[in-house]
Swiss-Prot record:
Record-annotated disulphide pairs: none
Entries under InterPro entries matching the protein: P-loop_NTPase (IPR027417), RapZ-like (IPR005337), RapZ-like_N (IPR053930), RapZ_C (IPR053931)
Similarity comment: Belongs to the RapZ-like family.
Keywords: ATP-binding, GTP-binding, Nucleotide-binding
Function in brief: Displays ATPase and GTPase activities.
Amino acids binding ATP: G8, M9, S10, G11, A12, G13, K14, S15
Alphabetical list of SUPFAM superfamilies matching this protein: P-loop containing nucleoside triphosphate hydrolases (SSF52540)
Protein name: Nucleotide-binding protein EUBREC_0697
The organism's place on the tree of life at top rank: Bacteria
Stretch forming the signal peptide: none
Binding site for GTP: D59, V60, R61, N62
Amino acid sequence: MKFVIVTGMSGAGKSTAMKMMEDMGYFCIDNLPIQLLDKLIDLSNTFHSDVSKVAVGIDVRNGSGIDAIPQTLEQLRQKNFPYEILFLDAEDEVLVKRYKETRRNHPLAGSERINKGIVLEREKLQYLKDNADYIIDTSQLLTRELKIELEKIFVQNEDYKNLFITILSFGFKYGIPSDSDIVMDVRFLPNPYYVDGLRAKTGNDKEIQDYVMQFPEANEFIDKLDDMIKFLIPNYISEGKNQLVISIGCTGGKHRSVTLANELYKRLSGCNDYGLKIEHRDIGKDALRGK
């Protein structure tokens, strides 16, 4: 099992890092009481599961439990349990600025100034920083740059992709998918719903595919969409985007949109730069309601 303790200064980006590690396939537990860390590891050794990577967030919100860290880590070493420590840090003035921008108080400051809380926190976390395997200073990092730094350290799973693309067909009559990044409307194409013998079929059937793709507009559309998506993919990856939902809609989500979604899926398949899947959201909806 890959076991990572994620810690660091409040305001340095620990919560953001935990979310990114979750995207990398880690099972994440934030703000775990120190007293439960040893028990969590015992449980992970007792039960066989599909969880192979765990990230545990620990910070000064643990209160007095943070003082037990040296003893707890020593117990892990005695059990020969492998773990790594990631420590996120930032310059004091940057931390103060971030707190002021969010109008939050430092967890150790109480009624004192933020600077006082930062000093106390550094004292409490010094042992973890001294024993950290990786230290990332986020003072000058953008969110996407932090993601890149984490990927350099932790991405070892060949199944993980920087970008995962979902191609989604849908019917406008049932609403545009709320998680869409790109929405394409293919209602400009002739509708097989009104062709005898085709109404009951779907875009997964060859008869519908042949009907839709016989029109030059359909082929020109998919050519241009394919070119646009292939242009966007490397730019999205460089900006740190990890999910892309391309929604293709017609009236009912059964014929035209399914056909074009399948065509795009075929064209984007076979590339190792991203993950890819296809969904037909409304293909099973009541055909009698129109297409």
